């Protein structure tokens, strides 16, 4: 275990799972819940929200626009055999943790040359650069530590120039009626409100995927209809800008 001083003792379902069909939560989401660009940051999410998402996976009301992606496929699969008691235990644990700032957002027209390392982008390290285009490219600052499940891993998220200003206007003001101010539901500091999750400081790759899934009917569980209305008038560049701005904030 990397940093046992960073978190309370791990419940069995987080540390070991339940063989043969329930993976350890901490393997993918790390011991204190930060996850990575490929999946969710669970640290500090409301307990009721985590439980609801597991229910949505199980009932088929939380799916993905890319059905072949491994992380959501695993979540849908393990939502069937995992017990309600294990979900309750994991949700209690992760909701008790404090999220950490781990993402630096950099606006740029070009980025270090990249390749796909498993489920994430990684830097080739050759000194070459490539155009960013209309993408978010989120790279572990130390790939080996990230792949070794270090929960203190940090990331650099490259976003197109102008994303932060545009995203800030959409998030804080609704973009002149294009959407709803995020603080309306997610709290004045965007760190959550009641059963609704904090969205400040979250992975921009992950947030973009969720906005896209809400907008295309792949998330239809509780509260999802409200989000579908929020993203209804947004195009992908708007979603990218929102995700970039949110990632730049302290969680």
Indicate residue ranges for each PLM-predicted region.
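Flexible coil segments in periplasmic/lumen-exposed cytochrome c-class electron-transfer proteins
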Residues: 1-27, 31, 62-181, 216-251
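Cys/His/Pro-rich metal-binding microdomains
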Residues: 26, 43, 76, 183, ...
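Cys/His-rich metal-chelating microdomains
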Residues: 31-32, 188
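Acidic/histidine-rich, surface-exposed loop or edge segments in extracytoplasmic proteins
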Residues: 34-38, 193
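Short cysteine/histidine-rich metal-coordination sites, predominantly Zn2+-binding motifs
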Residues: 41-48, 199-205
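Long compositionally biased, domain-poor regions of proteins
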Residues: 165-172, 180-183, 188-191, 195, ...
């Amino acid at each position: 275990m990397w940093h046992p001083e960073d978190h309370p003792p791990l419940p069995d379902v987080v540390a070991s799972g339940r063989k043969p069909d329930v993976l350890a939560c901490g393997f993918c989401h790390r011991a204190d819940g930060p996850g990575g660009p490929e999946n969710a940051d669970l640290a500090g999410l409301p307990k009721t929200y985590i439980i609801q998402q597991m229910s949505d996976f199980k009932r088929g009301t939380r799916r993905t626009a890319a059905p072949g992606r491994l992380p959501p496929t695993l979540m849908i699969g393990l939502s069937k055999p995992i017990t309600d008691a294990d979900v309750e235990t994991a949700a209690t644990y992760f909701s008790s943790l404090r999220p950490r700032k781990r993402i630096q957002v950099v606006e740029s027209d070009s980025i270090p040359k990249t390749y796909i390392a498993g489920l994430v982008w990684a830097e080739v390290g050759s000194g070459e650069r490539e155009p960013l285009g209309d993408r978010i490219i989120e790279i572990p600052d130390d790939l080996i530590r990230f792949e070794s499940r270090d929960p203190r891993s940090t990331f650099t998220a490259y976003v197109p120039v102008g994303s932060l200003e545009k995203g800030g206007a959409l998030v804080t003001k609704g973009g002149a009626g294009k959407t709803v101010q995020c603080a309306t539901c997610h709290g004045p500091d965007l760190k959550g409100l009641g059963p609704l999750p904090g969205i400040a400081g979250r992975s921009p790759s992950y947030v973009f995927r969720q906005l896209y899934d809400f907008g295309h009917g792949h998330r239809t569980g509780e509260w999802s209809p409200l989000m579908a209305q929020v993203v209804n008038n947004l195009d992908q560049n708007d979603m990218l800008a929102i995700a970039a701005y949110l990632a730049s904030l302290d969680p």
